[in-house]
């Protein structure tokens, strides 16, 4: 019984020590290998579109940042720190929708938010294929 309690406490401490508070990210690069990132210049209906697809977004380890002139909002945290906002604004340039893979590479740049297209792109990625296969086991 003591061993079981010890294993549970060590596991809990390990998880707490290794997990970073979502609000503490200061740069997009800190999310590498943890999340796929979607940077979006805000349009009136985009937040509702993203909210409606929250299950699919979560399943794909996708974090989105909706950028408007006055703020950046996200599904990751209630507030986005200023250094992270600056990093995000620098990454959105000629295309208002940017998908960044878990490896930190840009996977897609689009004019409009199309979740079916984004999900299809993500689902074709080798890392995503491995994630889906591991769920089946």
Enumerate the language-model features and the residues they cover.
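Non-catalytic interaction/Regulatory regions outside core domains
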Residues: 2-137
């Amino acid at each position: 019984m003591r061993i079981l309690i010890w294993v549970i406490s060590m596991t809990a401490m390990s998880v707490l020590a290794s997990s970073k508070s979502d609000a503490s990210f200061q740069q997009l690069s800190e999310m590498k290998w943890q999340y796929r990132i979607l940077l979006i210049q805000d349009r009136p209906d985009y937040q509702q579109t993203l909210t409606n697809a929250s299950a699919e977004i979560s399943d794909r380890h996708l974090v989105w940042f909706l950028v408007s002139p006055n703020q950046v909002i996200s599904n990751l945290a209630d507030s986005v720190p200023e250094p992270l906002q600056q990093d995000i604004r620098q990454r959105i340039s000629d295309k208002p929708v940017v998908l960044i893979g878990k490896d930190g590479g840009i996977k897609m740049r689009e004019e409009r938010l199309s979740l079916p297209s984004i999900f299809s792109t993500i689902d074709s990625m080798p890392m995503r294929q491995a994630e889906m296969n591991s769920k089946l086991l």
